[in-house]
Amino acid sequence: MAANLGEPINNEWVQQYNSGVNRESGMELPMQENPEWEKARQALASISKANATSADKGSESGQTNSQFVSQQGEAILQQQQYYQWYSQYNYSYPYNYYYQMNMYNGYNTPGQYGMPGNYQSMSSQSGQHQGNLAQPPVPGLEDSSMSYSNVQSPVSLCNTQTASHQQVNHSMTKPCIQGRNAGNQSNPHSSSNQPNYSQQSFNEGPKQKKGQQLWNRMKHAPGSGGFKFNIQKRPLVMANQNFASSEHHDNSAGQQQQQATHMHHPLQQPQQQPTIEKITEHGNNSSKPEDWPQAMKEYVQRCFTSCESEEDKDRTEKLLKEVLQARLQDGSAYTIDWSREPLPGKDGGKESPKKKRWEQTTLQTSHGSTITITQSPRGGGNSTNAATLRGRGSFIKKFGNRNVFMKESSSSSSAGSRSRSRSPSHSPHRRYRRSDSDSDSAYSGNETRDGGRRNFQKARGRGGHMDRGGRGRLQKGKRSDQAFSKKNRKKNPVAMELEDPEKEFKKEKRAARFQHGHGPKKLRMEPLVLQINNMDPSAADNLDWDEIKIVGNSQDITKHYLRLTCAPDPSTVRPVPVLKKSLTMVKADFKNKQDYVFACEQMKSIRQDLTVQGIRTEFTVEVYETHARIALEKGDHEEFNQCQAQLKSLYAENLAGNVGEFTAYRILYYIFTKNSGDLTTELAHLTKELKADACVAHALSLREAWALSNYHRFFKLYRQAPRMSGYLIDKFAERERKAALKAMIKTFRPLLPVSFVQSELAFANEEECQSFLAPLSLVYAGNDASQIDCKLSLAVLPNI
């Protein structure tokens, strides 16, 4: 076998097996068994003692399956099958008593009776056996990358066959991920099984590359099966490669480079930096650390040197796994300048300026290329409407050929492809979903990194196969993806937050309010509007009259009331002695002339002068009590209510005045307005001294009769009202008389005398009672209106 390594390629063999290249059916010419195979079987039979019994059975039938086991962290079984060629029938497959299978390789048609092909395509395996021992390839369908070239990339396949009669599907076998040094070789084992004739399924046709003919993918020249070269070639970097292309295709250039590097270097250094070993231990497509460029090794050491804690080292290790794996996968690790490559995590932590939801975000890369992302205005579905990638920049260097912006589907990936490898860092990142960065930047470091991993992992699972419309197949992963997207929309503040363009201006404006807070206060020079006793606090502009000390010097007895529009002039403000004279004049004038308009204007001007000078004395109480009595007499309950509010505040300052009288007025006013809340509060704050007051006692008795609907007692107390309580009772006396009349008509039958109504409802005379009953449309008995027919009057009670 060692002599075969140096033999040149047999030209006759090449002409013989290349004669059918241009055939349309892709069939092979008759061939004879290679005598070198018998030598290989004998050599393997002497080594494999564990499977001697099965090997003897295989030698009797003339059919052998060679299995080479390379224990590099996990058992990798390589199977090869050989079967006889029926040359008398002029085809390369066994005669199965029906038409030839795989005659038209380009058609994707089902097998016999509408079923898929029973025999799948075989992949020839070339394994190394302790040094220079090699075996020629099986004349079956090889991997599309195994052509006559200087660099050969044998693909290691996981052996899924455990029984002798179990069929092996080579086309669906996943590539074994080797994460340890290829130099640690183990003893190979061989086993032979029963004949297992394989034939390519018609459904596997689209998965093979179309650039090579069938013979070039199947054959090696005799004696050249173990002839290998160790010339490394930098794979072609495809500029228009999609993000997820390397994840969905098994025969990518990155895998060929990785597998060729593992198989062509049997001798490796036993010692290596522990940090680099950690990075390549779980990598699925990365090459050996010895084959890395020197600048790339120095870059890794620089990254770990910059770490300050163990957490930083762990984070850096995770980032380097992704960055280096992506670089080695697309071949850019040999082309980029590692000395200028930014350290992972250092360039992604800066916040980018916040963009609006519908605004295009442009990312500048290190090589001058740009990535433009248009954010979708709605959550859910595809989060990216347009993503334009020009060239390769730092963003692609960080994440490799993965579309981190796609949530549930990728328009650039193939429709029926499925990822056949799972990232080793899949599960740990699920713990960090609740610790994403809440930065304002839509593409901050932590948020982009974690979000990109989550979205990419979701696209790789079962629920990640979505069509272009955003609807996926009904699988188990779909519900979890939808639940996660709903949960992400609720807790992700970036997707729903709108930028306030005046945010900074408002902050500066708020900060400017406190710049001069400790300085001396100055008088307000702008015009002011002051309304005395106005319930709207904005009308007086929140003036603090305690700090504005004004002493008036005006001697005018009368003064027109004007609302203040500026700081008051002392020459227009009257002092207290002048105000006392003015109050005496107003009382006399109102008593004689009953001119309420003039009296109210003068009383309001007196109150204004007292307010601007900050005077709150017994004289102030007298002024407000006088104004309240005048307003109560004339029925101006709005002005009376304002005076009552000021009097309550003045009484709370222990200023002398008619506290009992106006407390009774306040109780009666609450009965008038039916304000039960304030009435209850007022009753709760009554002291024993106030309850003993005649006015307060009368008001409490009246309130009790009103609450019990005891109209007889109510109108009896109405006739006995002290001081000016009768004026307040007059406000709601008519309302209570109507309620009492309804109760009387319902109670008395058949007739109700009008004289009885007059006495019970506290009318002064019969004429006043008739004027009250006339608008009510009551029915009277007889021609005179002296008696009310209660039965007939029931119909008009709802209108009263």
Curated annotation (Swiss-Prot):
Residues 118-149, 175-229, 245-273, 335-394, 407-519 are annotated as: Disordered. It comes from the Eukaryota. Coiled coil: none annotated. Residues 120-131, 184-201, 409-418 have a biased composition (Low complexity). Residues 252-261, 360-387 have a biased composition (Polar residues). Residues 419-433, 508-519 have a biased composition (Basic residues). GO terms for cellular component: nucleus. Pfam families: SAC3_GANP. Residues 636-800 form the PCI domain. Residues 338-352 have a biased composition (Basic and acidic residues). PANTHER family: 80 KDA MCM3-ASSOCIATED PROTEIN (PTHR12436), LEUKOCYTE RECEPTOR CLUSTER MEMBER 8 (PTHR12436:SF4). This is Leukocyte receptor cluster member 8 homolog. The gene is leng8.
